[in-house]
Amino acid sequence: MDAGVKLRKPGGHMERPRKGTDAVTQSNIKSVGIIGAGQMGNGIAHVVALAGFDVAMHDVKQEAVDKARATIERNMARQVSRGVITDVDMHTALKRIGYAADLSSIGEADLVIEAATEDEAVKRKIFVDLCPRLKKGTMLASNTSSISITRLASVTDRPERFIGMHFMNPVPMMQLVELIRGIATEDDTFHQAKVFIESLGKTIAVSEDFPAFIVNRILLPMINEAVYTLYEGVGTVESIDKAMRLGANHPMGPLELADFIGLDTCLSVMQVLYEGLADSKYRPCPLLVKYVEAGWLGRKTQRGFYDYRGEKPIPTR
């Protein structure tokens, strides 16, 4: 079965997946549980199923599970129409994915990837509830984009089998996965995780367990500074995004990108950086805080720095 899809950027050209059979055998991982059926969870399920693994997806909200199923089917159908995968590939992969609102469906997985909201308390509770349901050898991973892997691992009964796997959004299209060891992570766990990620057709960037790791340590302060630039009246939403697209050759402006990521996620990462590094340069912009308080979280709520309720996005400031 073909391995996970490799793409250059959102809307970019997709490459044909490569075979991952040998890597799957070496990793001893055959089945994968995914907790969280949101944007990240369904994207991870998508690439993992295409790579030949059995997938069990869990979310506490049945509507999230139903939406994830529809999203995965729609995105795979789009790949078929573009010639990235065949119709047989799609139907075979879809049959590998099971959906359930019951956490016990995850219990027999060889690897469980947590992809819940970027809230440490929520993630810790998930792992506390999950561990008694798992078989002894199951490896645990978190898709956190900023939270300490060591702290998350500490609430489990297997910190040596715990690792950070930070996939980029959207998962089927983005090449990179950050791989993060906690202080207790064993070498075998790291090796198994590395082989697994490579079997998806992804490229690994290894990061130490510092707040926000590599990508978001660099990216989110830039986005936060763009919000400050808007907050202070230096430029409008349109002018800020245009300046960075055309002046720095970025594929998306920072405010457009913030809406795509989710303003709540942006705020969570900035709070982790601010609290973890104790440096005022990471203080979240008050305007970002206000937007999140208002429920303007970006594309997923149809309002953020742009209003998405019409035919095309309109800047809100």
Segments the model singles out, each with a brief description of its role:
Residues 6, 13-25, 188-191, 198-209, ...:
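NAD(P)-dependent Rossmann-like dehydrogenase/reductase catalytic/cofactor-binding core
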Residues 57-91, 179-190, 204, 211-219:
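Rossmann-like dinucleotide-binding cores of NAD(P)H-dependent redox enzymes
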Residues 139-208, 213-217:
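Rossmann-fold dinucleotide-binding core
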Residues 4, 13-75, 82, 133:
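NAD(P)+-binding Rossmann beta1-loop-alpha1 motif at the extreme N-terminus of oxidoreductases
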Residues 78-139, 147:
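Rossmann-like NAD(P)-binding element
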Residues 68, 130, 152-153:
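Hydrophobic packing residues within well-ordered alpha-helices of enzyme cores
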